[in-house]
C-alpha cells in the first residue's frame, strides 16, 4: 500500500480496508508502505503471500509483481505481463479484438484535438456517454 505514484493516498485507503477485512477473517497481516527501496523489508518479513493494494504506476504496471516474482513471493493481482499490458489501453483493445472479445468504439484523444474535439467525436460516430 502507499507507494510512489500519484495514487498514494487512495492506495493507503485500499490497503487499510483490505488489511482490516483480512484481520477480521483471522489472518495475520503486516502492512508495508511500498515507497522507496522496500525489498530488504520484504526479505526480512518472509511473507507467505503479499496482498497488493498499490494503485497506479509501480503497483498496477507489473513492477512490484516482477519484484515479488524475483523474490519467489506469491501475491494477489495479475501477473507481470497482464499488469503491464493493462496499462496500455490501446494495445489491450487490439488484443481483445484479435481474440474476439467485444470492445466499444473508441479513439485515442490527443492533446492536439483540444480545439476541435466535438468535430472529432462526431467524425468518429461516438455517442455519449463518453468515458
What kind of region is each of these model predictions?
Residues 3-4, 47-87, 102-108:
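A short, GP-enriched loop/loop-strand-helix hinge that lies immediately N-terminal to
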Residues 17-27:
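A short, Lys/Arg-enriched amphipathic alpha-helix followed by its capping loop at the start of a domain
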Residues 1, 42-44, 85-131:
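Active-site nucleotide/adenylate-binding loops and adjacent lid/helix of ATP-dependent enzymes
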Amino acid at each position: 500500500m502507499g507507494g510512489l505514484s500519484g495514487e498514494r493516498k487512495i492506495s493507503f485507503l485500499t490497503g487499510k480496508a483490505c488489511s482490516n477485512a483480512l484481520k477480521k477473517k483471522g489472518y495475520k497481516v503486516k502492512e508495508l508502505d511500498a515507497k522507496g527501496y522496500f525489498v530488504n523489508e520484504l526479505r526480512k518479513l518472509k511473507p507467505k503471500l503479499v496482498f497488493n493494494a498499490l494503485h497506479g504506476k509501480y503497483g498496477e504496471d507489473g513492477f512490484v509483481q516482477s519484484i515479488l516474482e524475483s523474490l519467489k513471493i506469491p501475491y494477489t493481482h495479475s501477473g507481470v505481463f497482464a499488469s503491464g499490458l493493462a496499462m496500455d489501453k490501446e494495445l489491450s483493445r487490439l488484443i481483445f479484438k484479435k481474440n474476439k472479445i467485444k470492445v466499444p468504439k473508441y479513439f485515442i484523444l490527443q492533446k492536439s484535438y483540444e480545439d476541435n474535439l466535438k468535430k472529432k467525436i462526431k467524425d468518429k460516430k461516438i455517442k455519449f456517454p463518453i468515458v
